[in-house]
Regions:
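Extracytoplasmic gate region of multi-pass secondary transporters
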Residues: 47-48, 248-307, 359, 363, ...
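C-terminal transmembrane helical hairpin of 12-TM major facilitator-type secondary transporters
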Residues: 316-365
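Conserved MFS/SLC helix-loop-helix module at the cytosolic interface between two early adjacent transmembrane helices
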Residues: 78-117
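Glycine-rich segments within core transmembrane alpha-helices of 12-TM secondary carriers
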Residues: 152-176, 198-199, 383-393
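Cytoplasmic membrane-interface "Motif A"-like loop-to-helix N-cap segments
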Residues: 88-100, 311-324
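Helix-to-loop junctions at the C-terminal end of transmembrane segments
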Residues: 79-91, 302-315
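Helix-breaking motifs and short loop linkers at transmembrane-helix boundaries and internal kinks
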Residues: 59, 91, 112-118, 129, ...
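Cytoplasmic helix-loop-helix junction between adjacent transmembrane helices
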Residues: 122-159
Length: 442
């Protein structure tokens, strides 16, 4: 962990005692939080695999599935702010425990839906339950870590969510292949039960493991608590601004539109890849699960390489724009590759990895685009616009699939959306508008 800390200049130059303090904090908090991010993502993605079997049992059309996949984000958007306000009142430990227990119970309860409308209601409740989890964790980190550590710690948490995509496919395939009929439950029911129950257990564990703030911990010494308090209190505070001023900032909405386009593509990957793979003529659930992990494996590698290149060259726009265009081109070519399973899998993996990799690339832009006073409010609005894409894009994909019987047209539409986002980025967010260019690095 000390080697990891050497990546952060402010910490690397600190005395060994300070380095030991933050190594201790990271070893205490990060394993739990990364595991929480993994189960969080799995409990979202599992629906895409359950659909392969549950559609016949509950008469779930592709249009209804698209609504169910998207309405999750509506519940999330509506209850995100109240959840964050609640966290400020009662503390992180109670809030994170409450969120994990509720989303775990809703996931398990989804195993017992018998109609499409019940599934849609369950997904809305899941969005309500999860609301505030990601921003709550980000806020929690500000209590424990100085700014020089929080950036890459956040990236590590996002990478943990990506690892869930690698885990969920093979895990779902094994559960649905070997546990059909176990304890009287069908394969898709066992999937929801066995992916939701660990979340409940982890939430209970979090109640005893997490501490709201450093000064309340019994695993830090008095000197270590003093060091953390001193480091965090010495950081310059953000300049205040009225939220109304943030809402009048055009660049925020331009960035929000770009994120909307990116999120439309990445969400389509998350919820429709297993269905797309089965459309290649493959029916074995274990094989589908293994192939569904490929885009996430490629995405993890691409995220690292693209992020490193973007940081080295201090260039954001073309890295992101070209990544989006590669994803869009791969999606558009899928229809032409019908009948060629190997080429279809290659295009699916490349396009999906590009769509997923675009997300961390995008989040290097808002902090550089917005002024310090408006960054916090602007980023929140941009995030909400992205979540709105989760609602609309999946309803659109489901409707197209129901109307045409094919996913290829839906992926063509998502390709056009991603090209639109790339053009908006490159035309309306000029390089000189970003504050972290190479010439400002010196």
């Amino acid at each position: 962990m000390n080697d990891t800390l050497s990546q952060y200049p402010d910490i690397a130059s600190a005395d060994p005692g300070t380095r030991r303090v933050y190594a201790k904090v990271l070893w205490r908090l990060m394993p739990f939080l990364m595991l929480a991010f993994i189960v969080n993502a799995i409990d979202r993605i599992n629906l895409s695999f359950a659909k392969l079997r549950m559609a016949e049992d509950i008469l779930l059309s592709d249009a209804a599935y698209g609504i169910g996949a998207g309405i999750f984000y509506l519940g999330y958007i509506l209850f995100e702010v109240p959840s964050n306000l609640y966290m400020q009142r009662v503390g992180a430990r109670r809030t994170i425990t409450r969120i994990m227990l509720l989303w775990g119970m809703v996931t398990v309860a989804t195993a017992f839906v018998t109609t499409a409308n019940q599934l849609i209601a369950a997904r809305f409740l899941l969005g309500m339950a999860e609301a505030g989890f990601f921003p709550g964790i980000i806020l929690y980190m500000t209590y424990w870590l100085p700014a020089s550590l929080r950036g890459r710690v956040t990236a590590g948490l996002l990478m943990a969510g990506m690892m869930a995509g690698i885990i969920c496919g093979p895990l779902s395939g094994v559960i649905m292949t070997h546990l059909d009929g176990w304890l009287g439950f069908k394969d898709w029911q066992m999937l929801f039960i066995l992916t939701g129950a660990p979340t409940i257990l982890l939430g209970i564990f979090g109640w005893f493991w997490l501490t709201d703030r450093p000064e309340q911990s019994n695993w830090l010494t008095a000197e270590e608590k003093r060091q953390i308090a001193q480091d965090i209190c010495s950081e310059p505070g953000a300049v205040g601004s009225h939220f109304g001023g943030v809402l009048r900032e055009p660049r925020m909405y331009i960035a929000g539109l770009v994120y909307f386009c990116i999120y439309s593509g990445s969400n389509t990957v998350t919820y429709w890849i297993p269905t797309l793979i089965r459309g290649f003529g493959l029916e074995d659930l274990k094989l589908i699960g293994m192939l569904a992990a490929l885009p996430f494996i490629v995405a993890v590698c691409a995220m690292y390489l693209l992020g490193r290149s973007s940081d080295r060259h201090m260039e954001r726009r073309w890295h992101l724009g070209l990544t989006m265009i590669v994803g869009a081109g791969s999606f558009a070519l899928l229809g032409l590759a019908q009948g060629n399973v190997v080429l279809s899998i290659f295009l699916m993996s490349l396009g999906s990895a590009a769509a997923l990799s675009a997300i961390p690339l995008f989040w290097t832009i808002p902090p550089a685009l917005l002024n310090k006073a408006g960054a916090a409010g602007g980023i929140a609005v941009i995030s909400s616009l992205g979540n709105l894409a989760g609602v609309l894009s999946q309803a659109a994909v489901g409707s197209i699939k129901s109307a045409t019987g094919s996913l290829y047209l839906a992926f063509d539409v998502m390709a056009l959306v991603m090209v639109l986002g790339a053009l908006v980025l490159l035309i309306w967010i000029p390089a000189h508008a970003l504050k972290d260019r190479r010439d400002s690095k010196a």
